[in-house]
Design a protein with these regions (language model features):
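Binding-site signature for planar aromatic cofactors or substrates
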Residues: 1-123
Length: 123
């Protein structure tokens, strides 16, 4: 793949804030809209999930997941020409008491300051 498409995908990941998270439970697919923050080097993606959410429960049972990041529909005739990237991987929980939590929280709030309320909730 040429450098130009890599740069376009990196820009797509860095400039968007929401994506579709896909998880599997008991062989059944489930999707949810989530907000995310990317690692500076794009080596990982942070998603803040409530313990009350079905998708967090599903990820704790089966961490295999994918994240679809897509540019917004702008009304163009060929909808399939919208830029998109699908990231596949395994989710890992960052515990509130863990050493990585303060930095992860700071990165998340730097991009999504409106999430401060979510971080203040006990779940």
């Amino acid at each position: 793949m040429a450098t130009e498409p890599h740069a376009a995908l990196a820009e797509l990941i860095r400039t968007h804030r929401q994506a579709t998270l896909a998880v599997v439970e008991a062989g059944q697919p489930y999707t949810a809209m989530v907000s995310y923050v990317e690692a500076p080097d794009l080596s990982g993606i942070l998603i803040h999930l409530s313990s009350l959410s079905a998708h967090k429960r599903m990820l704790l049972g089966n961490p295999v997941c994918s994240l679809l990041i897509c540019e917004p529909d702008d009304g163009r005739a060929e909808v399939m020409s919208l830029a998109r990237v699908n990231v596949q991987g395994r989710a890992a929980l960052i515990e509130r008491a863990g050493a990585d939590y303060p930095q992860a929280k700071a990165r998340f709030l730097a991009k999504l300051p409106s999430a401060a309320l979510m971080f203040s909730l006990p779940d």
